[in-house]
UniProtKB/Swiss-Prot annotation:
It catalyses: (2R,3S)-3-isopropylmalate = (2S)-2-isopropylmalate. GO terms for biological process: L-leucine biosynthetic process. Transmembrane segments: none annotated. InterPro entries: 3-IsopropMal_deHydase_ssu (IPR004431), Aconitase/3IPM_dehydase_swvl (IPR015928), AconitaseA/IPMdHydase_ssu_swvl (IPR000573), IPMI_Swivel (IPR033940), LeuD (IPR050075). Heterodimer of LeuC and LeuD. Keywords: Amino-acid biosynthesis, Branched-chain amino acid biosynthesis, Leucine biosynthesis, Lyase. This is 3-isopropylmalate dehydratase small subunit. One of its GO terms (molecular function) is 3-isopropylmalate dehydratase activity. GO terms for cellular component: 3-isopropylmalate dehydratase complex. It comes from the Bacteria. CDD domains: IPMI_Swivel. It comes from Methylococcus capsulatus (strain ATCC 33009 / NCIMB 11132 / Bath). Pathway: Amino-acid biosynthesis; L-leucine biosynthesis; L-leucine from 3-methyl-2-oxobutanoate: step 2/4. Its EC number is 4.2.1.33.
């Protein structure tokens, strides 16, 4: 994973509550476990006017002109602003894969489904919980050109008007995002200790390593 740095970005306002993982990435795309290449199919049923299929070339598909992700003013945005219970439904990890592959690094919402929330941290996305009144205010301001600054180190979201909102994040998850560590990377931080344990184990219980 890429280390999570402080950044400023335009904000995509997805003004829908209870967005489930099937809306984020429909079930027909779950056959692949490549972890990459899902960005073009993010919000597929809302984003396009036809039905998407795995490995389909999306460059010529008819776009839904009313869907917020298709509006040119939000192109390149890395922050998604959402409503409560974002990521509900099935536990598919493809949902954060698609969001990350599209380019989102942070999602702001009043609440998230638990499994989706956990999966975001494992895939380089920062899910930020702000109270509903604050999210309402951000939606009222999130027109074309509106930007926010996300600073994980200080655990703050800042507006262009000088307002700053603090968010909570578990210390271990913060460490992982700041250092770009997935589960494998976190384990490799203890590589020397693991090798030392294996070497000691071979001496104390050599029969476990005997080759027939």
């Amino acid at each position: 994973m890429k280390p999570f740095k402080k950044f400023t970005s335009r904000v995509v306002p997805l003004d829908r509550a209870n967005v489930d993982t099937d809306a984020i990435i429909p079930k027909q795309f779950l056959k692949s476990i490549r972890r990459s290449g899902f960005g073009p199919y993010l919000f597929d049923e809302w984003r396009y006017l036809d039905r998407g299929e795995p490995d389909m070339d999306c460059s010529h598909r008819p776009l839904n002109p009313e869907f917020v992700l298709n509006l040119p003013c939000y192109a390149g945005a890395r922050i998604l602003l959402a409503r409560k219970n974002f990521g509900c439904g099935s536990s598919r990890e493809h949902a954060p894969w698609a969001l990350e592959d599209y380019g989102f690094r942070a999602i702001i919402a009043p609440s998230f489904a638990d499994i989706f929330y956990n999966n975001c941290f494992k895939n380089g996305i920062l899910p930020i919980v702000l109270d509903e009144a604050t999210v309402d205010r951000l939606f009222s301001e999130a027109g074309p050109g509106f930007e926010l600054t996300v600073d994980l180190e200080s655990q703050t979201v800042a507006t262009p008007f000088g307002e700053t909102f603090h968010f909570d994040v578990d210390a271990s998850r913060k460490h992982r995002l700041l250092n770009g560590l997935d589960d494998i990377g976190l384990t490799l931080q203890h590589a020397d200790a693991i090798r030392a344990y294996e070497a000691a184990r071979r001496k104390s219980a050599p029969w476990l390593f005997a080759v027939p």
